[in-house]
Amino acid sequence: MRLFARLEVLAILACAVPIAAIPSFLSNSYPAHPAEGVSLFPQTQPQAPLGLWTRLRNTVIERLWRVPPQLNKNRPGKQGKFPLFSAPVSLRARYGDDVVLRFTIRNAEEVKALAEASNILFLDVWASTDEWVDIRLTKDVVPSLLGLLPQSLQTSHIPLIHDLPQTIYESYPSSSQRSSYDVQGFSPSTKHSSDITNIFFQDYQPFSVIVTWMRFLTSMFSSHVQIINIGSTFEGRDIPALQIGVWPANNPKPRKTVVVSGGSHAREWISVSTVNYVAYSLITSYAKSKHVAELLQQFDFIFIPTLNPDGYIYTWEVDRIWRKNRQETSLPFCPGVDLDRTWGFEWDGNITADNPCSESYPGEDPFAGVEAKQFSQWAKNQTAQNNIEFVAFIDLHSYSQQIRYPYSYSCLPNPPNLENLEELAIGIAKAIRLTNRETYEVSSACEGFMASQAKAKSDDPFPRIERTGGSALDWFYHDLNVKYSYQIKLRDRGSYGFLLPRENIVPTGQEMFNAVMVLGRFLSGHDGFGHLDWEDESQRPKADEDDIPSENELGENDDSWIPFDYRNHDDQNEGEGYDNDEWGFRRRRKG
């Protein structure tokens, strides 16, 4: 009965709305003009007649939710001319007139209305903060969305990405090869250039190249690197990882281990490249930096470039903005489980399990996601059988530049070591800021989906745009007792979203490498940032060795170690809410 009811509801909604989680095979039939209130699309295609399903959907929405019909009738852009795009026809056939809109939110009522409308229309929510929400949809659906929203939201949005197919096209490597692509048969290159100047981190890399690169590193640096297997994917692929560390012989103590994972969501390519960059920097710095050498003697590091190889490969071969894994669901046309909503701790899939087409579908049961279950079993086996003590977990995602600590599922319980979690998170944010002057916000993971009390001017937080139970962050922290667990959302703040240009790979990697160095220093019991190797070639900004004071020259809140380029930098407008004392490590651990 449950399955029948689910299919009945989905059948009705399928007639009323396009499903965002399904590749848009018919998207090139969508009209190309925006709704009222969206006047920033530069050039649009001539208006196409509405299809039968589109007209039926609009009628259902108008009658059930009382959408004013004029929103669908008086749409601008009828005189627009078709621009000359360089994106191939195959991409335009898949993504049609998809755009990304940013809605500015001001109160709880607006957030609730936006969340409900997104669920009704099966829209793809790209990111959300306490100030804005980014949503991907076709221009043809904009009138339906606006009709479900209050008047204030109908005018408080801007198009963030005007032309999704073009932006997707530009995210694939490589620009030098694009001229040879057949416009009618575009396929992104999966072969890395042999040019020595086109090094590994100058572009995003497909999974096959990443695995080959990992094996190469293992053979070149066998003294402190080995490749391991976390488990198998739904489609039978290995989930490879790099284990980095100097393993002492005959040591009965549990080996302290840090896990850095990326690519749970397939479309978040920058997280995959960043995991690789940090791993490479630690590996190659071992013989150059005494601080890195000390770190690898004290800790093992496990780097998992992508927990979701099936989905990652799918983003290269079929759909660049695919989010979930590729396993089967109860609806054959809606495959995939969200690998960051399927973990066993505070799994809330009983609320959303009826909609396999949702981008956040958690599966029908806890650990329904094959790769998440494999990862959890591997982690448990390591602690039970291999004398491993996990001391930190960093789960890299994109985008919005946030550092989040537990809990994700709710703001009501405070973590027992909340003060230490905040202290380390603030230290990581400072290291990032001093690397490339990028600002990352620090908050509990639940607050990442809600407005702060200061913004809401109330003790009641904003409602959630999407469910956040069943996260890897909460499971590692609570069930595996990993005291320092973080989810870090990388660059950018929405200009490109998941389609971050390749020029950001190295600077983002530099920021996270310094973040990991701060993490290691914190776990080692050191004060301040004295062991950050700013003179190391893997990090930025650069300074002469003589410019870095020794550890005993550093005071608790002394910033004299900062490279000369930043010593006179005005911090007043950065890191709002944190004074200079709050940025320093304040030695207040509670064990």
From Swiss-Prot:
Binding residues for substrate: 265-268, 323, 340-341, 398-399
Chain residue ranges for the region called Disordered: 533-591
Cofactor: Zn(2+)
One term under GO cellular component: vacuole
PROSITE patterns given in the database record: CARBOXYPEPT_ZN_1, PEPTIDASE_M14
GO molecular function: zinc ion binding
This protein's UniProt keywords: Cell wall biogenesis/degradation, Disulfide bond, Glycoprotein, Metal-binding, Secreted, Signal, Vacuole, Zinc
Annotated binding of Zn(2+), by residue: 265, 268, 397
Compositionally biased intervals (Basic and acidic residues): 533-543
Primary localization: other
Compartments it resides in: Vacuole; Secreted
Disulfide bonds: 334-357
Cofactor binding mode and count: Binds 1 zinc ion per subunit.
Keyword Secreted among record annotations: yes
Pfam families, sorted: Peptidase_M14
Occurrences of domain Peptidase M14 (ranges): 203-523
InterPro entries referenced in this protein's UniProt entry, alphabetically: Peptidase_M14 (IPR000834)
Family membership noted in the UniProt record: Belongs to the peptidase M14 family.
Functional note: Inactive carboxypeptidase that may play a role in cell wall organization and biogenesis.
The protein's name: Inactive metallocarboxypeptidase ECM14
